[in-house]
C-alpha cells in the first residue's frame, strides 16, 4: 500500500533512520512523502529539531484516507501488538524498499516490510508482513522470514533458512543453510546458528573476553 502520505509509527533511533530512507524512496517515487511521526511520547524528537514532527499519539491516531504506516519498531512483539491495534482501526501499512536494496525478480515482499539500504533478498526469498531487514543484511535463496520478525544490521540468512513469526535476530548473526527457527525465538548478536532453534528459545555465542588490559 503506497498511500498519499506516509506516517512513521515510533519516534526512536530507528525512526530517525527511516525518515532519511523514506525520503530517498519518496525521491525515487516509490513511497509517499512522510507527513510525520506518531508516538505516545510527544517529546520523543525534542532533541532533534527539524527532523520531523510528532503529529499525534498511537493511542489517538485514526487513519485518514490514503494514509500508509511504516513501523519504526524493532521488537517483534511490540510490532505485532501495534499492527493488531492499528489494523483494527482500518490502518494500512506501507512497504519500504530502499533504492539501494537488491531484490531478485522472484523475491516476495509483503506489506509493511522495511528493506533498509544495501539489504538483499535473493531468488525466491520471502519476506513476510511487517518484517524489518536492516542495513547490509541478506535473505538467501528460498529463505523465508515470518511476519513481524526483525533482522538487525549485517545479518546473513543463507539458502532455505526458515524463520517463524516474531523472531529477533541480533546484529552480525549468521544462520546456515536449511536451519529452521521457531516463532518468537531470539538469536543473539554475532551468533552462528548450525541447528534448528525451537520456538521461544534464545541462542547466542560466547561474548568477547578480555585477554590483556593495557
How should each PLM-predicted stretch be described?
Residues 96-211:
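Structural signal for interior beta-strand "rungs" in well-ordered beta-sheet cores
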Amino acid at each position: 500500500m503506497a498511500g498519499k502520505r506516509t506516517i512513521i509509527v515510533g519516534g526512536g533511533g530507528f525512526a530517525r533512520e527511516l525518515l532519511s530512507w523514506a525520503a530517498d524512496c519518496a525521491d525515487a517515487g516509490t513511497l509517499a512523502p512522510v507527513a510525520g511521526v506518531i508516538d505516545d511520547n510527544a517529546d520523543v524528537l525534542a532533541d532533534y529539531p527539524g527532523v520531523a514532527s510528532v503529529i499525534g499519539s498511537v493511542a489517538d491516531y485514526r487513519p485518514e484516507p490514503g494514509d500508509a504506516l511504516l513501523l519504526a519498531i524493532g521488537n517483534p512483539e511490540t510490532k505485532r501488538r501495534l499492527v493488531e491495534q492499528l489494523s483494527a482501526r482500518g490502518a494500512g501499512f506501507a512497504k519500504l524498499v530502499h533504492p539501494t536494496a537488491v531484490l531478485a525478480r522472484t523475491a516476495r515482499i509483503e506489506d509493511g516490510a522495511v528493506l533498509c539500504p544495501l539489504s538483499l533478498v535473493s531468488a525466491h526469498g520471502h519476506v513476510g508482513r511487517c518484517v524489518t531487514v536492516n542495513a547490509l543484511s541478506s535473505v538467501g535463496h528460498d529463505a523465508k522470514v515470518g511476519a513481524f520478525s526483525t533482522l538487525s544490521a549485517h545479518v546473513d540468512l543463507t539458502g532455505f533458512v526458515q524463520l517463524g513469526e516474531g523472531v529477533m535476530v541480533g546484529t552480525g548473526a549468521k544462520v546456515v543453510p536449511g536451519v529452521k527457527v521457531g516463532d518468537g525465538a531470539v538469536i543473539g548478536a554475532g551468533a552462528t546458528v548450525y541447528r534448528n532453534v525451537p520456538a521461544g528459545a534464545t541462542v547466542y555465542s560466547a561474548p568477547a573476553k578480555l585477554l590483556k588490559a593495557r
